[in-house]
Amino acid sequence: MSRRNPCKYEIRGHCLNGKKCHFSHNYFEWPPHALLVRQNFMLNKILKSMDRNNDTLSEISGAAELDRTEEYALGVIGVLESYLSSINNITKQSACVAMSKLLAEINNDDIKRLRNKEVPTSPKIRIYNTVISYIDSNKRNTKQTIHLLKRLPADVLKKTIKNTIDIHNEINGNNQGDINVDEQNE
């Protein structure tokens, strides 16, 4: 078997020369250095195509553009409620990204205050602890939290989303109530 040089176009992605190309396209014939260069190039290509700042959706697809996302039209809570009621064709990915953004908005201390008000045997304590753990995970690594949420079964994810929205509304309701009481005292 003759050992031909690896195709430089194949190393940098894909060779379009077809049968006219006289270089080797068989990876088993390539020297280790050429394989490493190809692997590094492909990994860099994947890394560049990922949008790490926004919502882990690809920039190439255009999904990261604000005016094209469901969140821009519906808001974070709207996306989650649409996913719960199965309207507006909200995907699990979009719901998980919106859930991650909602978790970033909620303050741990507010949930701990709500949890401390409950009776020690209350089933709500477990729900509060679950949401607190997701918030902590989200602060450490947003992408990993989104990945964990996506791996949940659909019914468990929906329960988690519903509980988180309820807690968010409860916190906002309490904060609004505190503001109204302060205004009345003045």
Curated annotation (Swiss-Prot):
A zinc finger (C3H1-type) spans 1-28. GO terms for molecular function: RNA binding; structural molecule activity; zinc ion binding. It is found in: Virion; Host cytoplasm; Host nucleus. GO terms for biological process: regulation of viral transcription; transcription antitermination; viral transcription. Residues 32-49 are annotated as: Oligomerization. Phosphorylated by host in infected cells. Only dephosphorylated M2-1 is competent for viral mRNA binding. Cyclic turnover of phosphorylation-dephosphorylation of M2-1 is required for efficient viral transcription. InterPro entries: Pneumovirus_M2-1, Znf_CCCH, Znf_CCCH_sf. PROSITE patterns: ZF_C3H1 (PS50103). SUPFAM superfamilies: CCCH zinc finger. Disulfide bonds: none annotated. Its main location: virion. The record marks 8, 23, 92, 151 as: Involved in RNA-binding. Residues 126-163 are annotated as: Binding to the phosphoprotein. Acts as a tetrameric transcription processivity factor that binds in a competitive manner to RNA and the phosphoprotein (P) to prevent premature termination during transcription. Transcription anti-terminator that enhances readthrough of intergenic junctions during viral transcription. Preferentially binds to poly(A)-rich sequences. Plays a role in the association of the matrix protein with the nucleocapsid, which initiates assembly and budding. Homotetramer. The homotetramer interacts with RNA. Interacts with the phosphoprotein (P); this interaction is required for protein M2-1 function, localization in host inclusion bodies. Formation of a complex host PP1/M2-1/P allows P to target host PP1 phosphatase to the M2-1 substrate. Interacts with the nucleoprotein (N). Interacts with the matrix protein (M); this interaction directs M localization to cytoplasmic inclusions comprising viral proteins L, N, P, and M2-1 and mediates M association with the nucleocapsid. Interacts with host PABPC1 (via C-terminus). Belongs to the pneumoviridae M2-1 protein family. This is Protein M2-1.
